[in-house]
Amino acid sequence: MNIDSFKYLLSEIFFIDLKDERGAFKKNVDYPVLIKDMRNIVKENKEDIDVKLFLKAMPIVLVLDNNFKHKEAYEEVIKTVKDFDKFLLHEALNEDADLDIRLIYAYYLKENYDDINYVYLYISLLEEKYKDKAIDEAIEIFENIYLNNKEAKYALYKLGYYYRFKKDYIRSKAYFEKYLKLENELEKKEEVEGVLSLDYEEYKIELAEYFIGVKKFKEAYDILIQNIDNAKDDRVFYYLSVVMTMTGNFKEALDYAIEASKDRQSAQYMDQLAISNYNSGNLDSAIAILEKQMKKEDYTPSTKEYLEKMKEQRDMMNK
């Protein structure tokens, strides 16, 4: 979270110099009150300020202005308040309050109290404010939690879903499987098992992509070829074509490329179809495929390079 983006809240605070000492509250110290709370005091014609209003504003100043001159005085006051964290938790959970202020409260609790529930509250409010943009910070926090506690079920559960959202199905599956080993609640287990079942095809594709990237073509082939007769995803055929190309099985590569491109004529797929035709001796067909993609202005950075090299070869053959 970018703390600086919340500093505008300092302009919504009014500072009061108490005339007399009030317990831990000292003279000659500027104590903060939210302007909206100050307005209510004036509106209701109150002479005294409830110390709770000071306590509500102090964490905002402490979080947003680390060099504030009365920082130590504020911290001393907070130390004297029994269960101050519970008081602030109540404010952070108040759905009628400003979300940014609630988030600052949660941040303060997370940073100053050793309670995992305050971390969870902070992440919850972070997600409420930033939606999907909060995921990277949430992942970092939950991964640190898991590193320090291998039985942190909730962290594993959330990490499984976060990586699923990012379409990183390998990590998602790994975290979900660790979670399942720890979870005893049947309903939760069934939920996660259902998600893993839905994501199996994506996991398989991603794992195959990984093996292709590290040139482990046999491992990629073994994953892709499983249940090939029931394959509903054209990416299975596309990556099988890539594997066959890389292992020199050009006839099979062409067969898979044709199958992959039946329902999807994307630039990536058509490049592979052209390469497979070229490797199978169908130079004219390969050129025709790439020329068609160029005319459609739907091509990859490599399409033009492939086309130029193939045309050069055809020209040399025709001389």
Residue ranges and their predicted role:
Residues 50, 80-89, 113-119, 149-156, ...:
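Generic helix N-cap/helix-start motif at coil->alpha-helix transitions
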Residues 95-96, 126, 163, 211, ...:
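Residue at a conserved register position within TPR or TPR-like alpha-solenoid repeats
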Residues 53-147, 151-161:
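Long, mid-chain structured domain cores
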Residues 78, 107-114, 142-151, 180-182, ...:
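Solenoid-like repeat scaffolds
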Residues 120-136, 205-263, 267-268:
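Alpha-helical adaptor scaffolds
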Residues 96-98, 129-132, 166, 214, ...:
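Structural motif corresponding to the intra-repeat A-B loop/turn of tetratricopeptide repeats
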